[in-house]
């Protein structure tokens, strides 16, 4: 049954990721991918902290959210492809800004999620 929940979570995450991708513009800053990945980092941190208090009795739900929903929502491969595209088009400042923003804020938001979740549990 766990596979079914992961499948459902994945379908919902993929759908949301698809809808967010419309925020990306041709040749512009990939804001949709950035939003999806930073949101995923925050929620993963939050759920990590909340696992002990709220998900210990519901491991299947946690897997549905983390592996299914967040796994489909976030997209490391698209992020890498966008960086290569920027490199190929000599958009070096945008590439650097996107990479640093994604990594630094991803780590920061995951940390904030962990701290916030720890305060709630």
Curated annotation (Swiss-Prot):
Activity modulation comment: Na(+) is not transported, but it plays an essential structural role and its presence is essential for fluoride channel function.
Keyword annotations: Cell membrane, Ion channel, Ion transport, Membrane, Metal-binding, Sodium, Transmembrane, Transmembrane helix, Transport
GO cellular component, one term: plasma membrane
Subcellular location: Cell membrane
Cystine bridges: none
Molecular functions per Gene Ontology: fluoride channel activity; fluoride transmembrane transporter activity; metal ion binding
Topology in membrane: Multi-pass membrane protein
Regions crossing the membrane: 3-23, 35-55, 64-84, 92-112
InterPro entries: FluC
Pfam family of the protein (one): CRCB
Residues annotated to bind Na(+): 71, 74
Catalytic activity annotation: fluoride(in) = fluoride(out)
GO aspect biological process, one term: fluoride transmembrane transport
Family indicated by similarity: Belongs to the fluoride channel Fluc/FEX (TC 1.A.43) family.
Function: Fluoride-specific ion channel. Important for reducing fluoride concentration in the cell, thus reducing its toxicity.
Protein name: Fluoride-specific ion channel FluC 1
